[in-house]
A protein has these predicted regions:
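Sec/Tat signal peptide C-region and signal peptidase I cleavage site
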Residues: 17-21
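Subset of outer-membrane beta-barrel
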Residues: 22-307
Length: 307
């Protein structure tokens, strides 16, 4: 881990003077749960049909055919890395999902004051510490007709040095999917989530609408998504995304563009870009987001398989 990686990651999400350790105790739970979502500005409440949808709205996995697998990896800020994986299985009206996300800050040697210099310099002990945040979640969804209702139970654990904090929380969500034409989704995330010492998982309400303008099983693809996000003690955010491409014979390319009216509490660009390669039931995704004062950008890659 590069020096100050933990602090930089926190500042990138939360404003200075009010870091996550004070009120909102998680970086990981505010990041997009899938590469497709990341490319569409972080929208996800009404993106249905993939296993990774459970990280934004548990009801989003209700429309999978039988099975869905998804995984992603992103070298994040200051040498840290974000990864996610999810699985969803549908049996009749019920869909069950399980997923995990991690934010790995790498490892750093333990440094203590050097008595030979009167404590003015440090010395390594030969040991190292490995800060991280990890989230495990499971979802259960019931669908009847066009409507679905789902719940998620999640466990978040964070460790920095010898300090460990953890919390249990839950999400609830609903979705209405009208064939492949449109989907409406609403979710409330991180109910509960007390990490102790006044730190809480960020409570967030999301409402979204996704529209398909073409048959998603046909040659041409065109989709838009619009989502409002309301996070506790933060300004509201409106996310807009568009996805389009050409797929023929089960093989094709898609491009994605997202825009989020984020409040000035993060150094991330308001614009996100991405794309993907479609190979039958397998999709390979990519997402890009620039960062200003921190320099550089993030690149996220992912795989989705829906047999």
């Amino acid at each position: 881990m590069r020096p100050l990686a933990v602090a930089i990651a926190l500042v990138a999400v939360w404003p200075s003077g009010r870091l996550a350790a004070q009120t909102e105790g998680s970086v990981l739970t505010v990041l997009p749960g899938s590469t497709r979502s990341a490319a569409l500005g972080g929208a996800g409440a009404a993106l249905v049909g993939d296993a990774g949808a459970m990280f934004a709205n548990p009801a989003g996995i209700a429309t999978i055919r039988h099975l869905s697998l998804e995984g992603s990896y992103e070298p994040y800020l200051a040498g840290s890395a974000v990864s996610a994986a999810a699985l969803a299985l549908r049996v009749r009206r019920w869909t069950w999902g399980v997923g995990a996300q991690t934010l790995d800050y790498g490892s750093e040697p333990v440094i203590v004051p050097d008595p030979a210099t009167g404590g003015r310099r440090g010395m390594t002990t030969g040991e190292s510490f490995h800060p991280y945040e990890a989230l495990a979640a499971t979802s259960l969804v019931y669908r009847r007709g066009f409507a679905a209702l789902g719940v998620t139970a999640k466990y978040d654990r964070q460790q920095i040095g010898v300090e460990v904090s953890d919390a249990w929380a839950g999400d609830i969500g609903m979705a209405i999917a009208v064939f492949d034409i449109m989907a409406v989704g609403v979710s409330v995330q991180n109910l509960g989530g007390d990490l102790g010492n006044g730190a809480l998982l960020p409570r967030r309400t999301r409402a979204g609408l996704t529209l398909n303008y073409t048959d998603p099983q046909g040659t041409y693809r065109l989709l838009t998504t619009l989502e409002g996000q309301w996070t506790r003690d933060r300004h509201a955010v409106l996310v807009q995304g568009v996805e389009g491409g050409i797929v023929t014979g089960g093989v094709g390319l898609v491009a994605r563009l997202g825009y989020a009216t984020r409040p000035a509490v993060t150094d991330a660009s308001r614009i996100t870009l991405g794309g993907g390669v479609v190979l039958g039931r397998l999709a390979m995704d990519y997402a890009f987001q620039a960062y200003g004062a921190l320099g550089g950008a993030t690149h996220r890659v992912g795989l989705r398989w829906t047999p």
